[in-house]
Amino acid sequence: ATLSPTVITGPDGTVEISVTSQTAGASTVTASINSSSQSRNVTFIADVRTAQIASLEVRQDNSVADGAMANTLRVKVTDAFGNALAGQTVSVMAGNGATVAPTVITEPDGTVEISVTSQTAGIITVTASINNSSQSRDVTFIADVRTAKIADLVVSQDNAVADGAMANTLQVRVTDAFGNTLAGQTVSVTAGNGATVAPAVTTEPDGTVEIPVTSQTAGTSAVTASINTSSQSQNVTFIADVRTAKIADLVVTRDNSVADGSTANTLRVRVTDTFGNTLAGQTVSVLADNGATVAPTVITGPDGTAEIFVTSQTAGISAVTASINSSTLSRDVTFIADVRTAQIADLVVIKDDSVADGAMANMLRARVTDAFGNALAGQTVSVTAGNGATTAPTVTTQPDGTVEISVTSQTAGISTVTATINSSTLSRDVTFIADVRTAQIASLEVTQDNSVADGAMANTLRVKVTDAFGNALAGQTVS
């Protein structure tokens, strides 16, 4: 306290002593003269008119942003000379959605605790004000790792090639119960349908992390991200690799069709990539040999397969080849001759002029084909022969479609041989000749008798020479 060091008494023996101070509290004032003194206490009080925020200190920081755990500050209110002011109402504000009592009242020491809660992680500015005096401090709320959950799982890259290298990607975001992002959190990851993924990933400062997923299997893969008891799943799609398209299978599904140019043998071609994933919409080149007819290209369906239809007018084996890129497979199909159109294609005399002895045979060869000239084996051909000749009534064709017809006769001359199948017929003539080996005088007849015996007029006779079966023999010398 401040006062004049001496005072002089007035006529009545008294004098006023004036004491001032800038320090609130009790001040002891002592008056002395000679060896006599007395003391009294005087009190100075803080000046509420100059109340101000003297300090604002953070006492508790980095509390969890759960709306319950509080960061705390201590505000001190003094007058202009630093004297603590009790019972002063301090206005308080907090930003970024934090919660705080709008006013607090100072304790006897001029201070008061301010509690701030928030559900939003981050920095909060707290401002304490009285009169026109204010101070601000920042406090930090942190996300609550105890309530970590999968907030989002979003596909950021889809439809990657199923080559085991190209990746589909997803972004997972981890937050606490109030949506505050959580960095450094370990997220467990699984992927279905044979896809490959890291078993765990760690979130970045923004609470997110990329998840790359690869696969060698085309189709849908369910990717699941989990933390604590929280999980989310999203589907990603892998597509077959058209760059590695190949012929995986070529299978005969129908064989032994008739070679009539319309009934088809069929094959099924399957196109996959290197890892066996079926490829739809792929153009496969097709060839067929031995005169068969096939569309030059076919296009695979959704299951990666396509039907190949092959027709032919030529019986036999046809090699069918399917190709894509540098991949090729071939399969044989068989066309068979059409027995419904069996016909006598040829009837050829291969031995003629046999002796009419009932044993020596003239020979013919019949050839049976279908309408397109394909040889028909195992076909029954009906045979007839004229002029008394003898032949088997039916013959059966060999694998080459031909059969030999043997004809014998005891009657010399021409015999017409006819071969018939269905409504088709051909005829050829063969000749049998009399057997000179068995020449004989068949008859000797007098044709002129009783002629005059004048050495000129003649009696005549006719001799007839035949073989053993009575066939006349010309050019025979008769003694």
Can you say where each PLM-predicted feature lies in the sequence?
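Thr-biased low-complexity repeat/linker tracts and other Thr-enriched repetitive architectures
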Residues: 1-479
